[in-house]
């Protein structure tokens, strides 16, 4: 992780920023632009990439590579050029709401029924979560009610980077051996989980969690 250049971790509510171009090459998907600093979140952790503009030119994908974060852009820039980045904030905030909502839902499922989230997909309209055990419609409705009670409570979402000793002692959902810095997202009373995504400040900002459907899927439940 190169947190010094990742503005979305310093403050996920940054909508505009200025930076300097450090690399720009033409690729198969347009121009691949790297910046000294960026607020554009790269696809990862189940969360879609941010969209927006760099100096008015569309950014239509963002990916993390071994070299750093690459912005796929419709226009070329000169190395050393100062530029202004602007996020598609509606898309970003929607993704933040959805991702935190997924944590709340998955955490409550795990706490009440012991099932793990074994699959997670976010798109523009719907989120799907696959759980490792079968839940009845009544149980899914129970989880939905508990989630919305947590939203009304407006619980603050905490972010921390425990050291190795503290991490070993810490209880969190889906715990497994991880290398490097481990970022813990904590929603008190609902969930604690390692996650690289960006989240809202408090559960009240999620707005509402509504289950559209649930079904048996590969020996478990898809919601």
Put a short name on every predicted segment.
Residues 1-222:
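A glycine- and charged-residue-rich anion-binding loop/surface
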